[in-house]
């Protein structure tokens, strides 16, 4: 049986919020079977919980924000991408502020944290959402699509009219049955344009952003001294974002996601459209792991 997974131990980290610039304390904790990923605002009394579900997404300006009434948690996508990539079904994410820390702008530090905590299999079958037919949403020349696929695959194309992008790969397709999320996707950092940063800061956004946690691009090129981690790091980060956004379905996917210039808003619209179309998907479990189209690495031992 492919079983659900949680963390073996509690683990903590500290960072800053990309948009708020505030110091944030993050604690990842094990959670019981069928809990899902639940964000907890531990700085509030009483603590407010927000399950990581598509219907709880509020704002999608520059990042994905979860809301419960007037309480929010910003920038959840990189941590959720790490949870998805390592197959974590159940966990509590405690935060001391309204934003997940940006760390280095990728999912890499979260992968390290989760691996350090260790993974534990639970005595319940892991649930997958299998895509049964194509579902597409489009808006303003952008497109996001689910298609049936026996495995999990993410294909993405970006289209930036800028010298830095023109010379680089702007499309990528990653089949996770043969490609490692940890090696090929998790370290891709978020990116931004120098020309946008002043505007964002005037609107109290990107206050914590720097070359320490993002690829910064100006008219001449990449400003980061160490350059890029992958030749196609820009489009790989869009794949990383999409994996995090897709995990708001609450289960791992069996299917392919195709994005063309898609972002957090359109990704969420695709999830909501899929959920409404009950004939487009089904929930499946696997009593025999050898019959599953997706193989997850064995639980990682605590370091």
UniProtKB/Swiss-Prot annotation:
Coiled coil: none annotated. Pfam families: LpxC. One of its GO terms (molecular function) is metal ion binding. GO terms for biological process: lipid A biosynthetic process. It catalyses: a UDP-3-O-[(3R)-3-hydroxyacyl]-N-acetyl-alpha-D-glucosamine + H2O = a UDP-3-O-[(3R)-3-hydroxyacyl]-alpha-D-glucosamine + acetate. InterPro entries: Ribosomal_Su5_D2-typ_SF (IPR020568), UDP-acyl_GlcNac_deAcase (IPR004463), UDP-acyl_GlcNac_deAcase_C (IPR011334), UDP-acyl_N-AcGlcN_deAcase_N (IPR015870). Transmembrane segments: none annotated. GO terms for cellular component: membrane. Pathway: Glycolipid biosynthesis; lipid IV(A) biosynthesis; lipid IV(A) from (3R)-3-hydroxytetradecanoyl-[acyl-carrier-protein] and UDP-N-acetyl-alpha-D-glucosamine: step 2/6. It comes from the Bacteria. The active site is at 264 (proton donor). Its cofactor is Zn(2+). Zn(2+) binds at residues 78, 237, 241. Its EC number is 3.5.1.108. Belongs to the LpxC family. Catalyzes the hydrolysis of UDP-3-O-myristoyl-N-acetylglucosamine to form UDP-3-O-myristoylglucosamine and acetate, the committed step in lipid A biosynthesis. This is UDP-3-O-acyl-N-acetylglucosamine deacetylase.
